[in-house]
Design a protein with these regions (language model features):
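Helix-biased detector of long, well-ordered alpha-helical tracts
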Residues: 1-203
Length: 203
């Protein structure tokens, strides 16, 4: 993911270690809840401001650009995720693109509730002002949040943990047994997640 070019110097740091329990991306279970940390979409707005594709007031402009350059990494939850997650993946290419990777090679599907997708107050304000739908922005990538799946029996624990460590964790959907089912439920209407694909790597 860091094989890009820049006219500035850059440094990559790799840390290796041991884990008591490895959370794999391909271990989701039928009926698992799907969670995501943090907010989605801010970074995409910031990128498009930098590309001069979006023009916005300065007070919001700096907020979104900072979210692109310095995303809110969900570091606090990493210490606990092995206690409740069956599968997990980070969001770099976009919510729905990375969900596809999470269930790759498993005969599973998912339904995401669009009304529960977490967005910031600033993004909510921007979308209302521009009369835009959140789905057009939250699946584009560069969020660097975590998607994970967990048994329904862990809901209470996850809710309490979210408050205790002050880390936003949102229940957004369910893993299903229909491998052709990649859907978004928006106000009772089922939409194909492929309509909201994120970043595609050309290699």
């Amino acid at each position: 993911g860091d094989t890009v070019t820049s006219n500035r110097s850059s440094f990559t740091i790799v840390s290796l270690g041991f884990s008591k329990k490895i959370i794999k991306r391909n271990n989701a279970k039928i009926g698992d809840d799907i969670y995501v940390t943090g907010n989605l979409g801010d970074s995409y707005i910031g990128l498009n401001i930098l590309k001069k594709k979006i023009y916005i007031k300065k007070k919001f402009k700096n907020y979104f650009i900072n979210k692109y350059y310095l995303p809110d990494l969900p570091i606090k939850v990493l210490k606990f995720i092995h206690k409740f997650a069956n599968s997990s993946i980070d969001i770099s290419d976009g919510l729905f693109a990375d969900l596809e990777k999470l269930i790759n090679k498993q005969k599973l599907g998912f339904i995401i509730n669009a009304n529960y997708l977490p967005i910031s107050k600033n993004l909510c304000f921007y979308l209302k002002k521009k009369n835009q739908k959140p789905l057009n922005f939250i699946g584009k990538g560069d969020d660097y949040q975590i998607i994970f799946t967990s048994s329904k029996k862990n809901r209470n624990y996850i809710n309490k943990l979210s408050k205790r460590i002050n880390q936003k964790i949102t229940l957004i959907g369910t893993i299903t047994n229909n491998y052709k089912q990649r859907m978004i439920n928006r106000d009772g209407k089922l939409l194909k997640s492929s309509n909201y694909e994120g970043y595609f790597h050309n290699f």
